[in-house]
A protein has these predicted regions:
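Acidic, Ser/Thr-rich low-complexity linear motifs
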Residues: 384-399, 615-618, 654-673
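Tandem amphipathic alpha-helical repeat scaffolds
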Residues: 387, 423-437, 459-477, 498-516, ...
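Tetratricopeptide repeat
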Residues: 407-410, 429, 442, 446-449, ...
C-alpha cells in the first residue's frame, strides 16, 4: 500500500522508518480473468485504438455476448496504461442509483469523508489524474451513469472512460461499439474454439472427441444454433459431461424448432440467449432449479453459509445446499472463485440471475427469500459489531468488505419492509461506516432509517451515535456536537451504561476537534476512570480512554496522556484488537514528540501505520504519515520529512479532508514539521521532495 521509506539520520534508531512509495507495479484494481480469452483479435485491436484516441467508449450488445470479457481483456496485461492507473467498477450488484458515486469512489480508492457531495469530490480528485475508468454493466443505471460520466469527463481532462452496457449512455462524444457474437463458420471459427475449450475445461477427456473426423461439423452446428453467443456456448459445453455432441445438437435443434413459429418481442439474439438459459434450466435437477431461483436475491458474490441460510427450506434442507450448489457450479450456472481474506465466493452472471428471479417470481417466493436474505445480513452485522473490538477484527474487516453489496441490498429491503430492523442494522454497522471508509453511504442509510423508524430505544440511540461518528469524519462538527448531546440524553434513559460511554466519547471528540480540549476531558475523563458501570471493559470505556488521552495531549499534559494511552494500548492488546490500539500508538507518538523523544515517537507512528494498513483506514494512514513527518523532521532528516508530507498530502486527498483533519493541535504539529524540514534543506529542495512523495501510490 505504501511500502517502506528509510530514514537517514545520525541516530541508530530504526524506528524512524516509514512508508516508501511502491515502484514497478501497475496501479489499479482489475479483477483476474476468470478463464482464458478466445478470439476477438480484430475487436481487441479496434478497441485498443479507440482507448488511445477517444475519451468515452461504450461496448453494447446482448447479455452473455462477452462485453465485460472483451473490456477486461483490452485493459489487462499492460495493453492500456495510465499514469494514475486503470480502475474497474463493477455495477452489476448495485441496485440503488443514489449509491453510484459511492461505488465509483470506493473502487478508485477515494474514501468518502468530505461533507461535499460525492460527485463534487470525485470530480476534484480526478481533476489532475490520468486514468482509465471502466464502468461494467451499466444498463440499469444509464441515466445516472450518463450524468456522472459527463461531470467527470468535463472536470478531468486526463480521464478515459470505458463502459459496458446493453444500451448506450447517449452522452455527447460517446463512441459506441457493438460487441457481436463470435463467428461460427468454418473449422477454425472463434465460436468453435470457445465451445471446444469450455467443454474440455468441464470434461477433459472431450479433447479427443473434438479431434475425431466429422465431429467438428456437429460442434459447428451447435455453435450455429446458439448464434455464437459465448455464455450460451459455455452452458452447452457444460452439458457435454452428460451428453454426446450429437445428442446436444439434436436436443438444441428440437428446442429451437419448437420456438421457430412462436411470436416474440425479443430480437433474435436476445431470444437465443434466453432460450439457451431456459434450456439449461430445464436440464437441471429440481433442487438445482429451486436453488437457482432463490440465489437470485443475492447481488454480487456470496459464500456458502449465506446460501445455506437464505436458500434452504421446504424440499431443500440446509444440509443439501452445498451439494446442490456444487451441481450448479458444474453446469456453469454459478461461478466459484477464491477471494483474498474472504474464502470461497459464488456469483451468477446477470443474464442467469435475471432468469432465476423470474422463476422465483413464478414460485411466489420473492418476498420470503428477500426477507431471509435481509435478516441474515442484519444478524451478520450485529455479530460483526460484537466482534469488532476483538481478535477477529481484521477478519471482520475483510468479511464485511466482501459483503458490501449484500449489506446494501439487505438495508434497502429492510427500509421498505422493517424500518426498525433497518435502524438496528445501520447502527450496528457503525464500524463499517466510520472505520472502513464508507462515511457518506453510512450517513445516508442512517438518516433514512432514523426517518422511518421510531425515535426511541436502544437501536435509535445507537444509530444517533453512529450518525455522529460519520459527521465527525466529515468535519461537520456542528452536527457532531448536536448529535453527541442528543445521544447523551437518549442514553441516560437506558439501563445499560454502554450507550452513555459511547455518547460521552462522541460528545468529547466533537468539542475537542475544534479546540476545546478542557471540555472534552471533562466529558470523557470521569467515564474513562469509572469504566463500564464500574467495570473497566467494553467498547465505550475504551473509546473514552482514547478521547481522554487525546485531550490530555492537546492540553500539553504529555506524561499523563502517555500513561492513559499505555493503559489503553495494553487493554486493546489483551483483546487482540488493532484499530483502537493503533490510535493509542498515535497518542503515544504525539506525547513522545511533546516530551522531546523523537525516535520513540517515530517508533509508535510506525506501529500505528501498520495497524491502519491492515484495516484500510485511510484517515488513520493520513494522520500517521503527517505525524511521522513531524518526528522525522525533529530527528533532522528534512528531505524524508518533506517526502512523507507529500505522501500524507496524497492520502489526505483520498479522504477528501484537509491535512490533520482540521484539528488545530494536529495541524500545528504538521506545520511544525514542515517548518523544520524547510529550515533543514531549503524551500526548493523541500518542494522537490514533497512532489516526489505526493506521487506515491495510495491504492
Amino acid at each position: 500500500m505504501f511500502g517502506e521509506y528509510s530514514v537517514n539520520n545520525n541516530q541508530s534508531d530504526s524506528a524512524a522508518r516509514g512508508p516508501r512509495p511502491d515502484s514497478g507495479s501497475a496501479l489499479g484494481n482489475l479483477p483476474p480473468e476468470s478463464a482464458s480469452f478466445v478470439g476477438r483479435e480484430p475487436e481487441l485491436g479496434h478497441l485498443n485504438h479507440l482507448l488511445r484516441e477517444r475519451r468515452l467508449i461504450t461496448l453494447t450488445g446482448v447479455g452473455g455476448v462477452g462485453k465485460s470479457r472483451l473490456a477486461l481483456r483490452a485493459v489487462t496485461g499492460g495493453r492500456q496504461t495510465r499514469r494514475d492507473g486503470v480502475w474497474w467498477v463493477e455495477l452489476s450488484p448495485l441496485r440503488d442509483p443514489a449509491l453510484l458515486s459511492a461505488t465509483v469512489a470506493h473502487a478508485v480508492g477515494l474514501a468518502d469523508h468530505s461533507a461535499r457531495s460525492l460527485d463534487e469530490e470525485l470530480c476534484a480528485w480526478m481533476a489532475d489524474k490520468e486514468l482509465l475508468l471502466v464502468l461494467d454493466t451499466c444498463e440499469h443505471l444509464v441515466t445516472e451513469c450518463r450524468h456522472l460520466v459527463g461531470e467527470l469527463l468535463q472536470s478531468a481532462p486526463g480521464l478515459t472512460v470505458l463502459v459496458t452496457s446493453r444500451e448506450p449512455l447517449g452522452s455527447p462524444g460517446e463512441q459506441v461499439v457493438e460487441v457481436r457474437p463470435l463467428p461460427c463458420e468454418g473449422p477454425d471459427s472463434d465460436a468453435l474454439a470457445l465451445f471446444r475449450e469450455r467443454a474440455v475445461a468441464a470434461t477433459p477427456q472431450l479433447a479427443a472427441v473434438f479431434d475425431e473426423p466429422g465431429r467438428a461439423a456437429v460442434a459447428t452446428e451447435v455453435c450455429r444454433w446458439l448464434d455464437g453467443i459465448p455464455l450460451a456456448l459455455e452452458l452447452a459445453g457444460a452439458r457435454l459431461r452428460l451428453w454426446t455432441l450429437e445428442q446436444t445438437a439434436r436436443r438444441l435443434g428440437a428446442r429451437f424448432d419448437m420456438l421457430a413459429d412462436t411470436r416474440t418481442a425479443l430480437v433474435p439474439r436476445h431470444q437465443t440467449m434466453r432460450t439457451a438459459v431456459g434450456w439449461s434450466h430445464e436440464l437441471c435437477e429440481p433442487l438445482e432449479r429451486l436453488l437457482w431461483a432463490r440465489l437470485s436475491v443475492f447481488t454480487g458474490d456470496f459464500d456458502v453459509g449465506a446460501a445455506r441460510a437464505v436458500c434452504s427450506g421446504g424440499p431443500l434442507p440446509a444440509s443439501r445446499v452445498e451439494r446442490v450448489l456444487a451441481g450448479l457450479v458444474a453446469k456453469s450456472v454459478v461461478r466459484r472463485s477464491e477471494a483474498r481474506g474472504a474464502g470461497t465466493r459464488y456469483t451468477m452472471l446477470d443474464t442467469i440471475r435475471e432468469f432465476g428471479l423470474d422463476w422465483l417470481t413464478e414460485l411466489g417466493e420473492v418476498r420470503t427469500v428477500a426477507d431471509r436474505h435481509a435478516h441474515w445480513y442484519a444478524a451478520l452485522s450485529r455479530a460483526a459489531d460484537r466482534g469488532w473490538l476483538g481478535p477477529g477484527q481484521v477478519d471482520w474487516y475483510r468479511r464485511m468488505t466482501a459483503e458490501h453489496a449484500q449489506l446494501r441490498t439487505a438495508l434497502e429491503h429492510l427500509l421498505g419492509s422493517d424500518p426498525t430492523a433497518a435502524l438496528e442494522m445501520a447502527g450496528a454497522l457503525w464500524f463499517f461506516w466510520f472505520s472502513c471508509g464508507h462515511v457518506h453511504e453510512g450517513r445516508a442509510f442512517l438518516e433514512r432509517a432514523m426517518r422511518a423508524a421510531p425515535c426511541t430505544g436502544t437501536a435509535y440511540t445507537q444509530a444517533l451515535w453512529a450518525l455522529g461518528l460519520t459527521a465527525l469524519l466529515q468535519g461537520d462538527m456542528e452536527a457532531a456536537q448536536r448529535l453527541g448531546e442528543e445521544c447523551t440524553r437518549e442514553a441516560a434513559r437506558l439501563a445499560d451504561p454502554e450507550p452513555e460511554l459511547r455518547a460521552a466519547y462522541l460528545h468529547a471528540v466533537a468539542v475537542m476537534m475544534p479546540g476545546d480540549a478542557a471540555r472534552a476531558l471533562a466529558l470523557a475523563g470521569p467515564r474513562a476512570r469509572a469504566g463500564h458501570g464500574g467495570r473497566t471493559s467494553g467498547p465505550g470505556w475504551l473509546l473514552c480512554r482514547l478521547a481522554t488521552s487525546y485531550a490530555l495531549c492537546d492540553l500539553g499534559r504529555f506524561e499523563e496522556a502517555a500513561e492513559e494511552a499505555r493503559g489503553l494500548h495494553e487493554a486493546c492488546a489483551e483483546l487482540g484488537e488493532r484499530w483502537l490500539r493503533a490510535y493509542a500508538d498515535y497518542v503515544l507518538a504525539v506525547a513522545a514528540l511533546g516530551l522531546g523523544e523523537h525516535g520513540e515517537a517515530a517508533r509508535h507512528v510506525r506501529a500505528m501505520l501498520s495497524g491502519k494498513r491492515l484495516l484500510g483506514d485511510r484517515f488513520g494512514i493520513a494522520l500517521g504519515l503527517d505525524l511521522l513527518a513531524a518526528a522525522v523532521a525533529a530527528l533532522g532528516d528534512g528531505e524524508l520529512a518533506a517526502r512523507l508530507l507529500g505522501t500524507g498530502h496524497a492520502w489526505w486527498r483520498t479522504v477528501g479532508r484537509p491535512q490533520m483533519g482540521g484539528s488545530p493541535s494536529l495541524t500545528a504539529l504538521r506545520d511544525q514539521g514542515e517548518r523544520q524540514a524547510r529550515a533543514a534543506i531549503g524551500d526548493a529542495a523541500y518542494e522537490s521532495a514533497f512532489r516526489g512523495g505526493a506521487a506515491a501510490t495510495t491504492g
